[in-house]
From Swiss-Prot:
Organism: Polaromonas naphthalenivorans (strain CJ2)
Annotated protein name in UniProt: Aspartate 1-decarboxylase
Signal sequence bounds: none
Record field: transmembrane: none
Binding site for substrate: T57, G73, S74, A75
Functional description taken from the UniProt entry: Catalyzes the pyruvoyl-dependent decarboxylation of aspartate to produce beta-alanine.
Length: 127
């Protein structure tokens, strides 16, 4: 049996471009792709913090060091430049490998520079 687990996450990235007439996808700075262990053409989920939109597309490379997050094609109607988004990908993991599996979590500052990388999410505590 397999479980679907979070594999990669880029947290609170700022959308830098929205290109409606570009072939559909999301262009992501290659530095961020590498840090989050995301591959070109890999399916990604995008969750827009500003408006609550959630959609699925695929990752393409943006110039390394550019800090670009470009939402393209029809998905460009679901984001605006400056919106904060969470970009995530999932993996099918065999049950026997679940205990040793950990995601690549990348946290960025407002200009999409990496500020922290982790492999765990803290337990949410009650108030």
């Amino acid at each position: 049996m397999f479980r679907t687990l979070l594999k990669s996450k880029i947290h609170r990235a700022a959308v830098t471009h929205c290109e409606l007439n570009y072939e559909g996808s999301c262009a992501i700075d290659e530095d961020l792709l590498d840090a989050a262990n995301l591959g070109e053409n890999e399916q990604i989920h995008i969750w827009n913090i500003n408006n609550g939109e959630r959609f699925i597309t695929y990752a393409i490379r943006a110039e390394r060091g550019s800090r670009i997050i470009s939402v393209n094609g029809s998905a460009a109607r679901r984001a605006a430049v400056g919106d904060l988004v969470i970009i995530a990908a999932f993996a099918q993991v065999e049950e026997k490998e679940v205990a040793g599996f950990s995601p690549k979590l990348v946290f960025v500052n407002p200009d999409n520079r990496i500020k922290e990388e982790r492999s765990t999410i803290p337990v949410q505590m009650a108030d």
